[in-house]
């Protein structure tokens, strides 16, 4: 199905024919954003959705593959929310993890934090550098 069937505002700048299967297979051409993205933006689903709505694909959908965890995860999350009315975390928990008795989470509530391994940030000069992705490097 076309993404714009569930997300009408998405149907602009060459994205009218992007299918959900393109997103799921990382071949949508949306492996990042041209607009600047700050770390705190990733936690604002409405801002991320608006960035996707304005973004032009970096390649013709279905012709190449490109992966960027933060962009693809948020894109899938917005589609799931538009279809199911649930966040990606709630959808996964209710529809997959709980029925299959899987201890796997997308997002955690505070009660689960003691179970999480400590993560140490890599040394880098600018935290926003993680969002730098050049389309020419994806060829």
Task: Describe each PLM feature range.
Residues 2-13, 99:
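Short, glycine/proline-biased beta-turn/loop segments that scaffold the active-site neighborhood
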């Amino acid at each position: 199905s076309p993404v714009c069937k569930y997300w009408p505002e998405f149907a602009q700048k060459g994205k009218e024919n992007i299918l959900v299967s393109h997103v799921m297979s990382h071949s949508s051409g949306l492996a990042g954003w041209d607009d600047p993205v700050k770390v705190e933006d990733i936690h604002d689903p409405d801002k991320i959705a608006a960035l996707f709505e304005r973004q032009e694909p970096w390649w013709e959908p279905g012709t190449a593959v490109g992966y960027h965890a933060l962009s693809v995860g948020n894109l899938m999350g917005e589609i799931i929310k538009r279809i199911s009315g649930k966040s990606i975390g709630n959808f996964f928990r209710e529809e997959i993890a709980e029925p299959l008795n899987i201890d796997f989470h997308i997002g955690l509530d505070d009660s689960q934090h003691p179970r999480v391994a400590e993560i140490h940030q890599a040394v880098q000069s600018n935290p926003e550098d993680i969002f730098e992705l050049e389309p020419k490097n994806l060829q």
